[in-house]
């Protein structure tokens, strides 16, 4: 069987047993707490939690079967966070950053008997894996661990092995919570699991195989895990049965396909198994071999340093094959290389691949050439790869060009640090490589390990923390204070926010906070929005005991209290102790709040339009909304064209005119509408707030918004620029700010129209005519200048003096620029043949000198650099250069003629 046939036979086997074949979900997970989709069950979590009824037959792209049974092959990435295989990839034959997880699921339908018996039927009956080589693990709790022996699974396996003519006592192995009990988290659904292990020793000795189960030996590995979700873990540490029991299984596709290839169809176990033997990697290996003119021989190093030449080559082949698959699939799912979170992980993987490409001698620009073989091998099952091939290649090209500009210099820095001795790369050098040259720490560690060196990670982390502290200090609104000594954030009560429905309210002062020169009031409740999620804090006024206090900003502390910053020109505040408990009337500056809300709602529309025009890979990377403008940072791999910006702006204003309602409501995170955008790294509780504009734009958001889209009035894009590799920034204005922006533009256009004596519609055409005329005049002027310069060169050459076989010209000459003076000097020297030319010209308040020496003049001891240095000094300046050409000058313009005459 080919790898593709193994995959398809798995899906067909379960489809024939009533399972709906669902497409792989995106590598961009729905849960903001996950870096990447890292298991087949991720997309089914809401069903397991009871937040969504089983309805898989209705899912887009599904091959329908039962709603309560599903099967698929899921793209997974494990690189970064808890699951991080990155540093091992390449050095063995079974680690990957990206892999496929084959799986089947039951949602309150069949349970252990069907799951285990079908699994056995597939791997022994359909695929032909020798039954004698298989072992099953069953949960047996250790001291203090939950539940009891999974007697049900044990009995099922006993029957399976007995019917196969095998001794169940030899082939069933028990494991504790670490190996055979699955938990989604500290609380929630959980249950025992049963794994199938495959003995890959050259002989099929049962006792030897049994000893290797769960021993971490690559000659006896787990190939399929069956998880039986039957309990709920409670907060008090107890476990209670679930009303509906589920099955969740997972099988590593590359692992099974690799074993099949390594063992010639599960028949020859003489060779070491390798996932990379699977033919799914063959197109990539062929392309790498063609590019590098080297051959993959499947060697595996015993250690990280002192590799043979062939081991180095084979490690690089495996790294490139794995990383090309990972980065291609990530970009296809909208995860672009970047500087934070999951985007930074993808950038690290890509740069690690580029570094290994250099080890194979591959030229800059090679990585994008690995996309075609990825599409060839994975495109039929993951069609988004073929559909987005061009985007994938363009992103890779830009990343490789960007990193290539600093890679060589960074390698030089590393080489110097390595040569300095001491047994370790200093943390300062590792930080410089990271901060200046874009080397992730693990890349520096990799380079160091190859030389038998360590990296001073403690010093590296210290410098990283210093940088983070500097960044925090630069943020104007980072207010972290405690109310009184001895209190912590946990002791303080968050402020009750009323501002979604009110712009004025009554409250009581509960604290006065002083932070340097700034004074903040804290109330028990407030209509003032505190800066959060990029939205500026509210301003307004607080009336306390008949005194009006201006509130110029509102921020939040760690306890969730709203801190109302008071303006500088205020009535004297009573002592803090006397102020606590005082009644207050709070009023938000409503026009200012409305302006901010317009910009916030406009930001949501802009995000929607960007994804519509540029693609769903666009993701918010940062945002700021003020009364005056909005700023939106987003992931994208190239500059947005003028035509694209026009279309984005048109779509946004089209939706403004359509005047859809802007609805906000709270729901449980796992029950939010499909397609609602959440942002990785943001902290979401169980209850979240959804902002829905017309059903087409849905985001989790805690900010304030307009009631209908038409309240935004108008949106105008002001600028688009790059702020980092893979990250763009758009600045725009909305509402009155947009109207003012248009008015300024119209005023400027009217002024230009008046100067050109042309109507606004004719300005562009009139300018094109004037520019064309100007260019023609410049061409004619340049021609005249060249003729004049040639004549001047003749005149200067004719006045040369001769000495010792050389000709000399020292003169003040007319030239319109230093470049023209140099050109004139070159012309004069060409006419002299062998000699020295020194020319000077005043430009404003500075005299400029150029000197040129022919080869014979240099041979005779004349040097342009020394001449210019001496003459410039006389003019009160300095200069120098090479023996054949130099430029300098000084500010004593009056001495120019005298200086050249003396020379």
Report the location of each language-model feature.
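A glycine- and charged-residue-rich anion-binding loop/surface
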Residues: 1-903
